């Protein structure tokens, strides 16, 4: 991390008599914020802050605001606003099922092609609906192979362990033109204290899955229950062992144990069998021929709904999908997406951003607090402002902020995106103060030794909300 020099808090008054109530004349950070930084053991030069009213031309607070910082998941603000602005809130994606010929007497001779377009939102339920459409159109037997067509994206090999050595975590899944169910398998842990054990139930259909291991039921508080589990994956088998506190109640455990092809194969075989279909072929990668005819298709929800899932819940793989959707041509490549978004930022006079995957799950991505602030100010004045603002978590109410700011002046009055990876904490969005004035607020901390990085950011938001 390069050395960071803080700027002083600047007081901008034009004219002064009209701005006394909305500006701070100080040579240091506001006392609540400075105190929170000290308590968290974050040096002031490892923090960047930017605050500006949406109807003002000058910031109230600009501390280290021009310094490139790692924003973690706050980078999703760039990706989602760019998507809304460039693609439009009504943009959708189609996933198609094609074949060389129509089915005869319920039998499809030859391969069935599944062609993806990069849909970020093809969940288990929506994939089931696509297969149900196939059945409704007369397909009951597939005699050939299932061919997975990912030609909409051209991507380098993805290593799910590269970021934090947690390859089974779904947040580490890579982008995929044929992404199904976020490449995720959902298990449910159900305490059974009477038998001293915990039941593990597979909620996501997966052909051939074998669950092994034993999870003991324990007393005490729930705490960080996931850290008490040991998870191993070997072929069709998932072994889960360790302990699980009965006080936790039922908990969902999401895993990404298989390659994309195997994950789709197991889900497809299980769902197709449930629908009464038969399949005797193999599952393989390939491309649909030009003469293939459409049999069934699924259209995604509009982008305006998708960005809500991305920002409310900080969904990384969905953000990666949107990032690639912004490439100007197909097959989409990461470099093409980076180039287009970088130019889009420059057109808005936001320079110096370093893009990687658009999700913020990166050690390389950078943007300044001022850059994020200018982005949010621009979004406020744009035609897609309602969709963008509605996509952000509401303080104390939903998404990643449901349990944050609940007993403060910010509750229900702040729409904010958070960012959290090791050594990084960030928050950025809009805050409505007690006088009904709306502010753009950005806070980024980059410090490997911080004790509680959320506290200074909470202090920042409260300080604005209480004005």
Where in the sequence are the language-model features?
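Mid-domain, small-residue-enriched loop/turn segments at the edges of structured enzyme/sensor domains
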Residues: 46-48, 105-179, 183, 326-371
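Small-residue-rich helix-loop
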Residues: 60-62, 313, 323-467
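Short, Gly/Ser/Thr-enriched beta-strand-loop segments that form substrate-interacting elements
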Residues: 210-232, 255, 293-298, 403-435
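N-terminal signal peptide c-region/cleavage motif recognized by signal peptidases
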Residues: 21-22
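A small/polar active-site loop signature that marks catalytic segments
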Residues: 217-387
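Short, well-structured active-site flanking segments
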Residues: 85-100, 280-284, 385-388
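Beta-lactamase-like hydrolase cores
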Residues: 25-55, 61-68, 128, 133-137
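Active-site SXXK
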Residues: 57, 71-89, 146, 178, ...
């Amino acid at each position: 991390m390069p050395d960071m020099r803080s700027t002083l808090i600047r007081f901008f008054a034009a004219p002064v008599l009209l701005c006394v109530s909305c500006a701070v004349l100080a040579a240091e950070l506001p006392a609540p914020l400075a105190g929170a930084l000290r308590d968290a053991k974050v040096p002031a030069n490892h923090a960047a802050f930017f605050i500006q009213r949406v109807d003002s031309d000058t910031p109230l607070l600009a501390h280290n605001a021009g310094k490139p910082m790692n924003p973690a998941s706050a980078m999703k603000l760039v990706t989602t606003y760019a998507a809304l602005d460039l693609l439009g809130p009504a943009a959708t994606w189609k996933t198609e099922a094609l074949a060389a010929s129509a089915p005869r007497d319920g039998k499809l001779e030859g391969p069935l092609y599944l062609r993806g377009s990069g849909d970020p939102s093809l969940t288990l339920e929506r994939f089931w609906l696509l297969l149900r459409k196939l059945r409704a159109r007369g397909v009951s037997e597939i005699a050939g192979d299932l061919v997975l067509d990912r030609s909409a994206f051209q991507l380098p090999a993805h290593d799910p362990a590269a970021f934090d050595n947690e390859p089974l975590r779904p947040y580490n899944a890579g982008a995929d033109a044929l992404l199904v169910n976020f490449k995720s398998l959902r298990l449910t842990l159900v305490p059974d204290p009477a038998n001293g054990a915990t039941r593990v139930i597979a909620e996501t259909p997966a052909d051939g899955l074998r669950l092994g291991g034993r999870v003991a039921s324990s007393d005490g508080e729930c705490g960080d229950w996931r850290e008490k589990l040991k998870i191993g994956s070997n072929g069709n088998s998932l072994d889960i062992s360790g302990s699980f506190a009965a006080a936790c109640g039922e908990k969902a455990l999401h895993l990404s144990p298989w390659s994309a092809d195997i994950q789709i194969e197991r889900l497809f075989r299980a769902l197709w069998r449930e629908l009464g279909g038969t399949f005797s072929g193999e599952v393989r990668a390939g491309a649909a021929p030009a003469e293939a005819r459409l049999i069934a298709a699924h259209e995604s929800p509009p982008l305006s709904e998708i960005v809500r899932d991305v920002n409310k819940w900080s969904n990384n793989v969905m953000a990666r999908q949107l990032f690639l959707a912004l490439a100007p041509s197909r097959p989409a490549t990461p470099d093409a997406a980076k180039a287009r978004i970088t130019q889009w930022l420059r057109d808005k006079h936001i320079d110096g951003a370093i893009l990687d995957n658009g999700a913020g799950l990166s050690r390389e991505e950078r943007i300044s607090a001022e850059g994020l602030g200018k982005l949010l100010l621009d979004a406020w004045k744009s035609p897609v402002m309602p969709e963008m603002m509605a996509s952000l978590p509401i303080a104390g109410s939903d998404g990643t902020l449901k349990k944050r700011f609940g007993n403060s002046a910010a509750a229900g009055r702040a729409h904010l995106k958070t960012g959290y990876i090791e050594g990084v904490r960030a928050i950025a969005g809009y805050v409505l103060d007690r006088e009904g004035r709306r502010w753009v607020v950005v806070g980024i901390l980059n410090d490997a030794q911080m004790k509680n990085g959320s506290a200074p950011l909470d202090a920042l938001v409260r300080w604005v909300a209480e004005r």
